[in-house]
Amino acid sequence: MTITAHMTPDTLDATFFALSSDLRRRVLDLLKREPGCNVNRVAEVFASEVGRFAIMKHLAVLELGGLVVSQREGRERRLWFDATPIQLIHERWTTEFSV
C-alpha cells in the first residue's frame, strides 16, 4: 500500500512541518520515552526553553501532523507518539522511489 492511500498532500506537508522543529522532535523523543505522559509533564521538561502556551502550540502542530495522539482523562490530557506517518513516508521513499 502506498503513502497516497494513507496521506493526502496536505497531511504529508503537515507531518514534514511538524518534524521541521528541533523542539517538536525533542517532544516526540520525550513521548517515546514516556508514553502517556500528560501536557504538564511536557511543559515541565521544556520549561527552561519555552512556556506552557508555546508547548500547547507545538503539541497542536504535532497532532495536525499525525505524530501525536491525545486522550482526555478527566482534567488531564495524555499524549502518545504515533510513528505511523513517519513509517508511511519511509515506505514511500524506500519502495515507490527505489531503483
List PLM regions with ranges.
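Glycine-centered, phosphate/nucleic-acid-interacting loop/turn motifs that mediate DNA/RNA or nucleotide
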Residues: 66
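Short beta-strand "wing" residues that participate in macromolecule-binding interfaces
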Residues: 70
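C-terminal structural segments of small proteins and small subunits
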Residues: 82-99
